[in-house]
Every structure is written in C-alpha cells, then in structure tokens.
C-alpha cells in the first residue's frame, strides 16, 4: 500500500490534490468526520421513522418528485436510480480523472450534508486506495442536476454492477470489489441520490485540464522566448517599466519570465543596435498575451479549488437543526464558465504559437532560410509542419466556443436550465492535445532557427531547452519523416520536462 494522507473533509487545496494524485497516496478519513456523517445519517433515518415526505428520501426524482414511495420500497428506489441513470456513452474517462472523481466524491460526502452511512464512504475510499476505478463513459451529463449519468457509472460497482478498471485492465465489478476487499452494498434511503447528485465529474475534468494547462503555459513561455531569439527579435518589449505602468500583475510576471529566459543571449547581443524598430505582435506582445492567459488560469484555479470542496448534493441535510432542504447547488454554471475561460486561454496559447511558427518559416520576416531548411525547393522543411499547427489552432478556435451559453431542458422541463459544465470541461482535453502539438512544432522550429545563428548561442537558460530537444530530435539538414519528431517533443512537454521551475532549480 502506498503512503497515505489524512483527508480533512472540505479542506482540499490544489497543491494537495496534485500531490495525492502524483504520488498515488492512499486516503484515510480524519476521525472528526465520523460524528458529522453519523448525525447526518440519523437525520435521514428520523424522517423515515416519522413518516415525513421529503424529496429524494421517499419520493420519485426529477419531474416525478411528487410521487411518494412507500417505506418498504426505499432501498429498491435507491438501487433503481443508480441503474436507470447509468446510461452514458463515449470513450471511458482515463483512470487519472476517475481517481480524482472518487477523491472529490469522498471529500463531498464526508462533510456530513448528504445523510449517507460511513460504510458507503469507506467503500469509496477502498476503491480509491486499491486503484479500482469504475468505468465511466465520457458523455451523458448536462451539468445539472449534477453529473447524474457519469456518477451513476461511478456508483454501479458498489452494487456489484458494471465494470471497473484495475492496472489498465477492464474487469467485472464483482472482481473489482474483491480486489478492494468489498462486497456489494445495499443502498439505504437517499444514498443513491447522494452518490449521483454532485459535480465531481465536471470538476475533475476541469481540474485535470487546468493542471496540464499550467504545464503548457510554462512551455509556451519557453518556446516563445526561443522564437524571439531564433527570429532575431528584441528583448526591449519585456522591459519591466513597460509592464509596471499597465499594472496587471500577471502581465508583469510574464514579462519577468521572458527577461529571465533571454538574459545572456549572444544572439540578442549581436543585433542589439540593428535598424529593426519593432517586432511583429506575436513576438513583441507575448507578455500581454500570456499575462492574460495566466490571469485566466489563476481565476480558474481559485474557482475550482472552491468547487473541489463544495457541497453540490441535493437535498442537503443540516443535522444540527434537523432540517433537510432542497436547493440547486448541483447546477454547474460556475464550472462551465471557468472551463470556458480556460478554453479561451488554451486557444490563445496555441494561436499565438502558431503565428510565431508562421513568422519563423517566412524568410521575409525572420531572415532565416525559407521554411527553416537549406536547399528549400528540394526540401520543404517546416512548410507542412506549420500546416499541422494551423489545423490544430483552427480546431481550438471552434472548440473554444462557450458551452455555458448553451442549455437544453430535460426531465419534462423540470430541469429547464442546465449548465453543460461537463462538456465544457471535457473538450479542454482535446484542446490540450492540439495545443501541445502546436508548442512541440514551435520548439522544433525555434531550435532549428537557432542552427542558422551558430556559432552564436542563445541564453544559458534557453540552451538547456535546445539541448533537451536535440537529445531526441536532430537538426533538419534535409527532409525526413516528420511526425515522430513532433510526438517526441509532445511527450517531453506533457512529461513536464520544459518547466520554468526546473530551469530555475538547475
């Protein structure tokens, strides 16, 4: 068993979430949560004992909320909601995302507002700790009432239904439960609804995208700096005085990153007093562009940290007052809007990088050989690699269309406005693939551009990146099979090898 962390319900930070997932820590629930969970469950039991009618406990669901269910059918009701709602489709979510969904659901239920038993939460913890991941199709949620469909698939294995994945292999839920030391559960009142109501899938998809996007942000700062040197660009636009008087802290921070990366470049010193007055915007305005990107990522991070600890169940149990209240915390509008903002940021990262690639291959702008290859004509060089980048950038622009402005009524118009948070977050992963492709091509193009400046060198910091690229992709002295080179650099990007923190610590 891996090392464990003690989960303090409602106190997850983005840093702790990353650590838990990266280090594959197992989960132990803080003991002080036990009484909160017990009191919440007792409140639900009291409703049943007193024969009160409360939504989600002894009624139907959605537009069937006005139908009262008899006491002897309550367990069947909870089983039925899981089975009937498990109707997702599409590719299965990756294990890393499912692990995060489990963690968020455990964190949600453990705060004592859902009325479930500790036994149910412990079963989820066992799945998480033994890396038994329910098979969750990626499509089917509209982000209100929560992520009903994918969370139903998350819950199926607890009943002994459906399939799970363990060590990359799809196996039956029955086998998975044995691996986790569990037997199928019989759900009690409200437990099925509590499992299904919530925004943990939308939040997990958005969080996992944010974590990778932070890596792409750093890579784009590095690749953009390399492009400045390869194109004989100026570092004057990164002067701190320019950015201080605009006042945006994220822009000020971004400009500092460019200054630090370019400091000490022999290439820059060789043309410091040349006649070129101003660079194209894709070089000159990088702090303004990437500062705006950083600002959006910071906003998204703040939003998702709150949501990671938020109670998005319905109805909600307030055990201290003995109240069970119906509300709308399951509506994912804030997640959808955060995901839309992150989509804009990803599109701008890729779009500005594509423009720099176009600049580098154009001899009239960069002063480098056409398409970054000698004997152009005989060789096409980076001509079509740029086309691939353009294709990905264009794809991102379509994917960046806001999902939060969309809504389709469901459940016979009872759920008449929905957030589309899940699809808003899910499409980010396709944008990440596109953006990492574009950045890989820019890194290759910029490093190729540096070849034509030899014996002059780029800065010591950027030379580390150049050497890292050249460790897996040699210089293009003539045309060759290009696609594998892009994939090699994409892997380095996604493995976080092009990190500003790594450069700083070396």
Curated annotation (Swiss-Prot):
Cross-link 5-imidazolinone (Ala-Gly) mapped to chain: 144-146
Modified residues (2,3-didehydroalanine (Ser)): 145
GO MF annotation terms: histidine ammonia-lyase activity
Pathway: Amino-acid degradation; L-histidine degradation into L-glutamate; N-formimidoyl-L-glutamate from L-histidine: step 1/3
InterPro entries documented for this protein: Aromatic_Lyase (IPR001106), Fumarase/histidase_N (IPR024083), HutH (IPR005921), L-Aspartase-like (IPR008948), Phe/His_NH3-lyase_AS (IPR022313)
Compartments where found: Cytoplasm
PTM comment text: Contains an active site 4-methylidene-imidazol-5-one (MIO), which is formed autocatalytically by cyclization and dehydration of residues Ala-Ser-Gly.
Keywords for the protein's UniProt record, in alphabetical order: Cytoplasm, Histidine metabolism, Lyase
Biological-process GO terms, alphabetical: L-histidine catabolic process to glutamate and formamide; L-histidine catabolic process to glutamate and formate
Entry similarity comment: Belongs to the PAL/histidase family.
NCBIfam families: hutH, PRK09367.1
Name of the featured protein: Histidine ammonia-lyase
